[in-house]
């Protein structure tokens, strides 16, 4: 049985509240779970206690092979329970082909304009 440590949504409409649960991956998001190991209240201010974790039980479930989801892994990394690997995608921040062509054309136009301006100043 593959286990995930994930968020289960509670609360009312437009007032979310999430329980951090250990559940089978085949269970629905808000459905059956094995154990509730924490809570996250995103409506609280940033400096308040937004995330509550039962660290002892989370360590137990991680030892049993449970995999945290990305959002829960961020919480565990902030609490120092599990290290979140750094993403390595160096090409994501680069512009696409069309944007690179536009940049090259603008650079060429600027160089041509600078050369023309220098030629005009040299002839005078």
Curated annotation (Swiss-Prot):
Q: What does the similarity note say?
A: Belongs to the bacterial ribosomal protein bS16 family.
Q: Which Pfam families match?
A: Ribosomal_S16
Q: Where is this region: Disordered?
A: 81-124
**Alphabetically ordered keywords of this record:** Ribonucleoprotein, Ribosomal protein
In what ranges is there compositional bias, type Basic and acidic residues?
91-101
The name on file for this protein is: Small ribosomal subunit protein bS16
Q: Where is the composition biased (Basic residues)?
A: 81-90
Question: Single GO molecular-function term?
Answer: structural constituent of ribosome
Biased composition (Low complexity) is annotated at: 102-124
Looking up HAMAP family in the UniProt record yields: Ribosomal_bS16 (MF_00385)
The question of whether Ribosomal protein is a record keyword is answered with yes
* Species of the source: Bartonella tribocorum (strain CIP 105476 / IBS 506)
Q: Name one GO biological process term.
A: translation
Gene Ontology CC entries for this record: cytoplasm; small ribosomal subunit
């Amino acid at each position: 049985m593959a286990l995930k440590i994930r968020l289960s949504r509670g609360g009312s409409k437009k007032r979310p509240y999430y329980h951090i649960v250990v559940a089978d991956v085949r269970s629905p998001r808000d459905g059956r779970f094995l154990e509730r190991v924490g809570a996250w209240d995103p409506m609280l201010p940033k400096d308040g206690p937004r995330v509550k974790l039962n660290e002892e039980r989370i360590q137990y479930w991680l030892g049993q092979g449970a995999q945290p989801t990305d959002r829960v892994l961020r919480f565990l990394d902030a609490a120092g329970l599990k290290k979140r690997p750094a993403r390595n995608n160096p090409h994501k921040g680069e512009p696409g082909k069309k944007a690179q062509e536009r940049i090259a054309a603008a650079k060429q136009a600027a160089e041509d304009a600078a050369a023309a301006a220098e030629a005009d100043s040299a002839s005078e």
